[in-house]
């Protein structure tokens, strides 16, 4: 593909999943922006349930939204034209250019979806080229670029690199161990024409003094003929991992934590970036709780979003965690549900089309919810996809913004209006029901609710008041300002430890 007028594309590949491609791509975007360029993030195909909704109402992976912010651009679904959202049983929802186009099984995906996917990727590239005629594409690969059984129908790695004649950076995670085998093994599986695209190696998550790796750097450069352009130090995780399996290992204890919030780690957990602003609160300790483990006595519980709401609800009930949560709420505990989490708090959930992992023998029947909010939810094929701005009336007045992303339509049970208050000026956005013993159960469809600084602090102060703690200041900015600071911090470290000139050909 011709990229006339645009600078030569760059591509970040990894020796494995979790090597750090997403954050290195974000850092590269921000560094190029600092140098006066217009970087354009792009990942042809991503598999993730951590999604974002752009201004047009299109779904895309959160990691590409983050890279867009790093590039100083508004996220748009063309930056991630193919999104696969796993939903269990080796199936995924297929999103093309922001819209759902069907469901695919793993064993037949490439047979059925390769050609449509490649067509959509090329269309998205043309759109971006028209929008940013003098920009530079910053491409992110997926997993390893040398999965031999998948290379023939690769949509994300070397096919795209060759198509765009991109200069590639290969990232390896030394924290996992075996970094030399990772790099040499990856390069040995590349064809000569593919290996020529690799212009630099990057060692990620190195602990200790950089000079301790000098011998390793020299050996790699002599063995491969490719420069090691950087050794990135190990950093405390700044942003959520792409894979929810990494969540339990992410964080340690906070010395200054004053309240503990338990977050249910659902089997089909989605949009866990919703919790980032709480993770960034120095006085808040998040504790992830899996089905089958003990809930304990946290100061509050959050049920996050789910890609398979009914299946996850069934998991909570079978494991006993659902009944623990009911007891906790009825004893005065604070419970907050986001999207699918709010739906689980309701009375019933009906999934006549089998969209959310129905586990009953009769798909037309409904499943009992946790019955902590008087809501009935029906899942429909049409999906609510939109950004929105509202004014809340609970816990107090606050301007909030975020996005909706859900199949379910929730309605209050007739006659329950006196016991439940709408959370915002849009009554369908969420509800709150006060417990008899001071705690409150509430839920919302608004993803990103905790990014709103004033609202987040108002909610935390409800919990703090019940513990006899002083209120936190509520006159604080939106989390996007803190995200900017984190991106700048990441890029400062990247700029100090990585020389991108060989990648740029200078």
Swiss-Prot record:
The keyword NADP does not apply. Residues 258-455 form the GATase cobBQ-type domain. Pfam families: CbiA, GATase_3. One of its GO terms (biological process) is cobalamin biosynthetic process. It comes from the Bacteria. Keywords: Cobalamin biosynthesis, Glutamine amidotransferase. This is Cobyric acid synthase. Pathway: Cofactor biosynthesis; adenosylcobalamin biosynthesis. Catalyzes amidations at positions B, D, E, and G on adenosylcobyrinic A,C-diamide. NH(2) groups are provided by glutamine, and one molecule of ATP is hydrogenolyzed for each amidation. The active site is at residues 339, 447. Belongs to the CobB/CobQ family. CobQ subfamily. One of its GO terms (molecular function) is catalytic activity.
């Amino acid at each position: 593909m011709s990229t006339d007028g645009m600078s030569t594309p760059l591509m970040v590949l990894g020796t494995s999943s979790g090597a750090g491609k997403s954050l290195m791509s974000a850092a590269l975007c921000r560094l190029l922006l600092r140098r006066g360029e217009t970087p354009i993030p792009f990942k042809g195909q991503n598999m993730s349930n951590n999604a974002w909704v752009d201004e047009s109402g299109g779904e895309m992976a959160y990691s590409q939204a983050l890279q867009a912010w790093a590039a100083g651009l508004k996220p748009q679904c063309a930056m991630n034209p193919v999104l696969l959202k796993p939903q269990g049983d080796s199936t995924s929802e297929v999103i093309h250019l922001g819209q759902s186009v069907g469901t695919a099984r793993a064993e037949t995906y490439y047979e059925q979806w390769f050609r449509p996917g490649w067509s959509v990727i090329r269309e998205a590239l043309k759109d971006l080229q028209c929008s940013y005629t003098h920009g530079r594409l910053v491409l992110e690969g997926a997993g390893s670029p040398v999965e031999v059984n998948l290379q023939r129908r690769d949509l994300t790695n070397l096919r795209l690199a060759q198509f765009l004649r991109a200069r590639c950076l290969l990232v390896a995670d030394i924290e996992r161990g075996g970094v030399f085998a990772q790099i040499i093994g990856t390069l040995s599986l590349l064809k000569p024409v593919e290996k020529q695209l690799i212009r630099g190696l990057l060692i990620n998550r190195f602990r200790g003094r950089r000079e301790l790796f000098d011998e390793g750097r020299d050996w790699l450069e002599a063995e491969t003929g490719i420069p090691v352009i950087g050794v990135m130090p190990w950093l405390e995780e700044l942003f959520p991992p792409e894979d929810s399996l990494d969540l339990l290992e992410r964080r340690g204890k906070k010395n200054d934590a004053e309240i503990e919030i338990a977050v249910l780690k659902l089997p089909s957990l989605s949009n866990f970036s919703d919790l980032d602003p709480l993770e960034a609160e120095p006085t808040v300790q998040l504790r992830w709780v899996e089905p089958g483990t003990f809930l304990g006595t946290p100061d509050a519980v959050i049920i996050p979003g789910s890609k398979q709401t009914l299946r996850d609800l069934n998991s909570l009930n079978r494991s006993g965690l659902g009944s623990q949560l009911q007891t906790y709420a009825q004893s005065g505990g604070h419970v907050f549900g986001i999207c699918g989490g709010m739906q689980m708090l309701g009375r019933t959930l009906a999934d006549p089309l089998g969209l959310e992992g129905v586990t009953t023998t009769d798909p037309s029947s409904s499943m009992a919810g946790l019955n902590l909010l008087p809501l009935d939810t029906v899942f429909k094929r049409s999906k609510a996809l939109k950004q929105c701005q509202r004014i809340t009336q609970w816990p107090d007045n606050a301007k909030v913004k975020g996005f909706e992303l859900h199949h379910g339509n929730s309605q209050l049970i007739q006659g329950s209006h006196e016991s439940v208050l709408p959370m915002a000026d849009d009554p369908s956005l969420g509800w709150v029901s006060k417990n008899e013993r001071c705690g409150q159960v509430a839920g919302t469809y608004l993803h990103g609710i905790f990014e709103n600084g004033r609202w987040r602090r108002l909610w935390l102060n409800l919990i703090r008041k019940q513990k006899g703690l002083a209120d936190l200041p509520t006159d604080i900015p939106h989390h996007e300002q803190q995200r900017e600071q984190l991106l700048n911090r990441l890029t400062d470290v990247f700029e100090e430890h990585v020389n991108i000139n060989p990648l740029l050909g200078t």
